[in-house]
From Swiss-Prot:
It is an enzyme of class 7 (translocase). SMART domains: AAA (SM00382). GO terms for cellular component: plasma membrane. It is found in: Cell membrane. Disulfide bonds: none annotated. It comes from the Bacteria. It comes from Deinococcus radiodurans (strain ATCC 13939 / DSM 20539 / JCM 16871 / CCUG 27074 / LMG 4051 / NBRC 15346 / NCIMB 9279 / VKM B-1422 / R1). This is Phosphate import ATP-binding protein PstB.
């Protein structure tokens, strides 16, 4: 039996002023999956990713047309509170961005505190659960009150994942989360994705096609603002329907 849709993009276009950066994208995402967006630089994959939690609201001149449905509700509806929506759709950026003046513990629970949660025992439970979910607990359990900036780059990125997990998002967006990390740290985060999809749904932008093939259930190939192909990862990489996809995944351009 096919699982229900969690996210459905319908005729989504994104503009910066008069320039159309993403063109009429239609894309469905099912719960409990890892979904990779691939394509050359400037193809629209990150632009589309940022639309899924309304980050373009913060960009002067940017606008999004079409519909992005989360559990059947258009996230761009005037009745939707963007702040509340972003608690349902978390984001991990390309470079680790822990809050520099906060401890490891305070970084993880920052989102909960903003919603008014103050109970220390509850915050500690959430911090431990989230750090375990990000495969970081054993490395930092004795350093919770130390500055987050004292962690290594790979640890800081997993801390950012824990911070996103703390508010229990339905979707976790990841914009090239390993591009600034060494191979060992990259491997830890890749290993983590299989466990994370048990508790959330992941959409990851990556320039690394080997990474997309290793970690994702579905792959979407973007090119010059168009969604060229979307399907099961094995199919996209071994038997693509579009010759442009075949040319890209085989390394003939990119």
């Amino acid at each position: 039996m096919t699982s229900p849709l969690l996210l459905s993009a319908q005729d989504v276009s994104i503009y910066y002023g008069d320039k159309q950066a993403v063109k009429n994208v239609n894309l469905d995402v099912r719960p409990g999956t890892v979904n990779a967006f691939i394509g050359p630089s400037g193809c629209g994959k990150t632009t589309f990713l940022r639309a899924i939690n309304r980050m373009h609201d913060l960009t002067p001149g940017a606008r999004v047309t079409g519909s992005i449905l989360l559990d059947g509700q258009d996230i761009y509806s005037p009745s939707v509170d963007p702040v509340a929506m972003r608690r349902r759709v978390g984001m991990v950026f390309q470079k680790p961005n822990p809050f520099p003046t906060m401890s490891v513990f305070d970084n993880v629970v920052a989102g909960l505190k903003l919603t008014g949660v103050k109970n220390r025992d509850h915050l500690m439970q959430v911090a431990e659960r989230s750090l375990r979910g990000a495969a970081l607990w054993d490395e930092v359990k004795d350093r919770l009150n130390t500055p987050a900036t004292g962690l290594s780059g790979g640890q800081q990125q997993r801390l950012c994942i824990a911070r996103a997990l703390a508010v229990e998002p339905e979707i976790l967006l990841m914009d090239e989360p390993t591009s600034a990390l060494d191979p060992a740290s990259t491997a830890k985060i890749e290993d983590l994705l299989g466990d994370l999809k048990k508790v959330t749904t992941i959409i990851i932008v990556t320039h690394n096609m080997h990474q997309a093939a290793r970690v994702s259930d579905t792959t979407s190939f973007f090119l010059v603002g168009d969604l060229v192909e979307h399907g099961p990862t094995d199919q996209v990489f071994t038997n693509p329907r579009d010759e442009r996809t075949e040319a890209y995944v085989s390394g003939r351009f990119g």
